[in-house]
A protein has these predicted regions:
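Generic "edge-of-domain/loop-turn" microfeature
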Residues: 6, 18, 23, 92, ...
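Long, low-complexity, intrinsically disordered segments
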Residues: 456-466
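Sec-dependent N-terminal signal peptides of Gram-positive bacterial secreted proteins and lipoproteins
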Residues: 2-26, 418-436
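Periplasmic/cell-envelope proteins involved in peptidoglycan metabolism and beta-lactam response
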Residues: 2, 10, 191-194, 437-443
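Active-site-adjacent loops and short helices of periplasmic peptidoglycan-processing enzymes
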Residues: 4, 16, 26-220, 224-233, ...
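Domain-terminus/edge residues, biased toward the C-terminal soluble/receptor-binding domains
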Residues: 199-200, 211-216, 220-423, 430-450, ...
Length: 466
């Protein structure tokens, strides 16, 4: 009986395991390479210096796989110190380089790019931003702020400059309260906007990027957000300002002046004339994060680096050189295989390495008119189009085939459930039958023993009577 129970339990456990692995997936834990993972002593027993440990972590980060390197004929990208990174073509959304690009990481102050986007789309530059007591709670020691006072007022233009250049946390909070009506509603607006942009691994808990374990982005999502944000001329104007001064206010009698913090935009060691916008970030939990927009010969790219201990600017330059030197934009309308589509913009293009040909790409036209091009599953361009008249019948058949395939995929989990349940029921039925057979055998054995005992008693009685 116990064996039967154990068997039932094993079958049920196996069924549950199959359901968990085949149908559902666990939430991804946000993890980084940590000092705890590094051996603290050398082979001869000496304790390692902090610099040595940091160097080993950086080497491990460099060795993390780059997804795009696995693509056939794709030019291999540079090693970077960041645990995640991406290079996206701003003209068409093509992914030129991707390293852990869909993993979740803490963004720190690059969050403020989304804050700026939502603010610009839902306010006027002349709107008044008033600082509440709650907003001043962000003025922690060690965190960026510009010492705003309770009930102090500035306009939205001043506030956006303070947030994007000085990275002022209390200003980001006050912008959220002003635009959203409540701070909580503004954060909700940020998350809704992220979904509209196609972000799948992003969730915001605040407007300034201060650490929260439920506040995260992926490199791909951050590139999508930046691409949209930097399409706003007002934000580009702010980002390209080297120095800004907020005049005296209703409370402060002195001007506040601050400078651009992105070191590729100011004269110095890391200055790069190709850089036309970006945002820095850092917390103890996120390490260094950096977003940079670059332009060369009319081509624009956005570079995102997450979870980096060091060398973010050197890595950004290396990724920019890699992208501009090894990739080219191909106009879609000039390609023979694109003739099945109509109403494509003359400027629409894909971006691919010089060793990859357009004929090797796969295309997908979505119902909303979005035309996407892929190379071995990697996105290389997005535009809008319609199916040409002579291909509409073919397209309808393809759409029906895709819908049928989708329906099969949707019903597959339920089929698996029914199969597993059927297996469980069969096993249980067999166990019941086996237990019944075993019980019948025991009853038969008991009857045999009882008859044997009766015969022995009868024999004993006969002997006694004789």
């Amino acid at each position: 009986m116990r064996k039967g129970i154990r068997l039932i339990a094993s079958v049920l456990a196996g069924a549950i395991f199959m359901l968990n692995t085949g149908i559902t997936s666990c939430a991804e834990e946000i993890t980084y390479l940590l000092e705890e993972d590094i051996e603290k002593t050398t082979a001869d027993g000496k304790e390692k210096e902090p610099k040595e440990i940091k160097k080993e972590i950086i080497e491990k980060a460099k060795a993390l796989p780059v997804e795009t390197d696995a693509l056939k004929n794709w030019t291999k990208g540079p090693e970077i110190c960041g645990e995640a990174g991406i290079v996206m073509d701003m003209d068409n959304g093509a992914i030129l380089y991707g390293k852990s690009m869909d993993r979740k990481y803490y963004p720190a102050s690059i969050t403020k790019i989304m804050t700026a986007l939502v603010a610009l789309e839902n306010s006027q530059m002349t709107d008044t931003v008033t600082f509440s007591e709650q907003s001043l709670g962000c003025q922690h020691s060690g965190y960026a702020h510009i010492a705003m006072k309770k009930d102090e007022q500035i306009n939205m233009r001043d506030a956006l400059h303070a947030m994007m250049l000085a990275s002022a946390n209390e200003v980001a909070y006050a912008i959220g309260e002003t635009v959203g009506g409540t701070y909580e509603h503004f954060v909700q607006m940020m998350n809704e906007r992220a979904k509209e942009l196609g972000c799948e691994n992003t969730h915001f808990m605040n407007a300034n990027g201060m650490f929260d374990e439920n506040h995260y982005v992926s490199a791909r999502d951050m590139a999508l957000i930046t691409r949209e944000a930097f399409s706003k001329s007002e934000l580009l104007e702010i980002m390209q300002t080297p120095q800004y001064t907020i005049p005296v206010t209703n409370i402060a009698q002195e001007e506040r002046t601050f400078q651009q913090k992105h070191r590729m935009m100011v004269q110095g060691k890391y200055y790069d004339p190709r850089c036309f916008g970006g945002k820095t970030g850092y917390t103890d939990q996120s390490y260094n994060t950096l977003v940079t927009a670059m332009e060369e010969n009319g081509r624009k790219i956005v570079i995102v680096i997450l979870g980096s201990r060091d060398h973010t600017y050197e890595d950004t330059k290396a990724l920019a050189d890699y992208a501009f030197q090894n990739f080219e934009q191909i106009k879609i309308t000039e390609q023979e295989t694109a003739k099945k589509y109509s109403e494509i913009s003359e400027t629409a293009c894909v971006t691919i390495p010089k060793d990859v040909e357009f004929k090797d790409l796969e295309s997908e036209l979505k119902p909303n008119g979005e035309l996407r091009y892929f190379y071995e599953g990697n996105l290389v361009g997005v535009t809008t189009a319609k199916l040409a008249a002579e291909h509409k019948i073919e397209g309808a058949a393809l759409k029906a085939e895709q819908q049928e395939k989708k329906a099969k995929q949707e019903t597959k989990p339920w089929k698996m459930i029914w199969i597993i349940l059927a297996i469980v029921l069969i096993v249980i039925s067999l166990l019941v039958i086996l237990l019944q057979i075993r019980a019948a055998k025991k009853r038969k054995e008991r009857m045999r023993r009882r008859r044997a005992m009766q015969r022995r008693r009868q024999q004993q009685l006969r002997k006694r009577d004789s």
